[in-house]
Amino acid sequence: MTKWFAYILLASVCLLLSCGGKSVREKFAEADRLVNENNLDSAAWLLEEQITLSALSDSDKAEYGRRLAWLHLLQGRSLVNDSLIDYSVDYYKEHASEPLLSAYFVKAIYMGDSRKGLEQRRALYREAIDSAYSRSDSTYLVRFYDRLTSLSFGEGLYRETIAESKEWEEIGRAHV
């Protein structure tokens, strides 16, 4: 009798523990809602304190990295510690996932905050432009060309800036 009671008690505890929390996707949706309502601190608390990174699947880890870096960007926080965005970009490239372009955008900003080399940043923008072009995403094409030409101009690379601007103009004509 005691043995059966112990089994029933153990099964009940396991059942209660498994039903207790929200799924990671529900937490992501809740964080999105909080961001849309401009409750950035609450969204940060949810992502940073309520999600255990080591328990996430690969796809959830990529999504977590992209969302957290984007949130830090919206909060005006330094992105120096958001190296998980590298994982997100690599995962989305490997799986040809939809969030790739937004992950590129956040990674480019992260690279600027971490003072990565100029050529690394230019190469990232080139890669992002190619990806946006292959997806026919004119919004991200404009964003990435704008960032690339601004970076080149800011570094005094005037010939490159002119060449990139002409390339941007040609692509614009092709999409019209």
PLM segments and residue spans:
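A "functional boundary" signal
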Residues: C19-R173
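Positively charged n-region of N-terminal signal peptides that target proteins for export
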Residues: M1-A6
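Bacterial N-terminal signal peptides
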Residues: Y7-L16
